Amino acid sequence: MSEIVTRRFNAGPVELAYIDEGDGEPIVLVHGFASNKEVNWVYPGWVTTLRRAGRRTIALDNRGHGASTKLYDPALYHTDLMADDIRALLDHLGLARADVMGYSMGARNTAFLARAHGERVRCAILGGLGIHLVKDGGLPGSIAAALEAPSVEDVTDPQGRMFRAFAEQTKSDRLALAACIRGSRQSLSPSEVAQIAVPMLIAVGTKDDIAGSPRELAALVPGARALDIPGRDHMLSVGDRAFKEAVLRFLEERP
């Protein structure tokens, strides 16, 4: 595969970075909190896997992440805004519809997009997010304090320590991430989730203690399928082979 080129476009005042590789039916990939398009999708082999399956593979850096604009006002990370960034990318590329797959926070953004603009989403794949789309507001706000701490050694909360270490590993802007976690903790109600009318696959690792049950969420979304990713936690589910195989099957079978 040739070198992957990062491209950019403006969504209002925010410059968003993305990659656009291959030909075929388009799929847009939306990464999780404190990650980026490379860490979530390129390095674990998703871009290669999808291209080999004949898919045009598009992945963006969410606002505040990767090579996209860093923002420090929590209000600018509302999930409605982040979901609309995906719609803006579709507009920029001249795509009326695409399959959309998100992981963790990216799955939340994908669900919000599917509800607000279902006509733009051919199918939605939610990885690393189950019933916590409904039952809570995403990752706990204590993670913001962990990101703002002087060093990882100052963080005692296990989940906060994990995300602080991950943010350092991905060389992220920790203050932008702290603003993101404070501003993007919106949920959908059961009645709002029931309005989603696109084919949906919900995949969660059996050792994931962050996402919540995929089956509980699937029961609320008409026609949704749930998938267990065996033996994987929140971080290790992303590149799992069984997850990839299930996604490829789902893409082949969806209308």
Language-model features, listed with the residues they occupy:
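Conserved HGGG/HGGXW glycine-rich cap/lid loop of the alpha/beta-hydrolase fold
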Residues: G12-T69
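Active-site loop/oxyanion-hole signature of alpha/beta-hydrolase fold enzymes
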Residues: V42, T49-R52, A59-D99
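Conserved alpha/beta-hydrolase "nucleophile elbow" surrounding the catalytic nucleophile
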Residues: A98, G102-A107
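Flexible "cap/lid" loop of the alpha/beta hydrolase fold
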Residues: R108-A116, R120-S151
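Hydrophobic, aromatic-rich cap/lid helix
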Residues: R164-S189
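Short beta-strand/loop motif that positions the catalytic acidic residue
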Residues: I196, I202-V204
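Conserved alpha/beta-hydrolase "acid-adjacent" motif
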Residues: D209-P214
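Catalytic active-site module of serine/aspartate enzymes centered on a nucleophile-bearing elbow/loop
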Residues: I229-P255
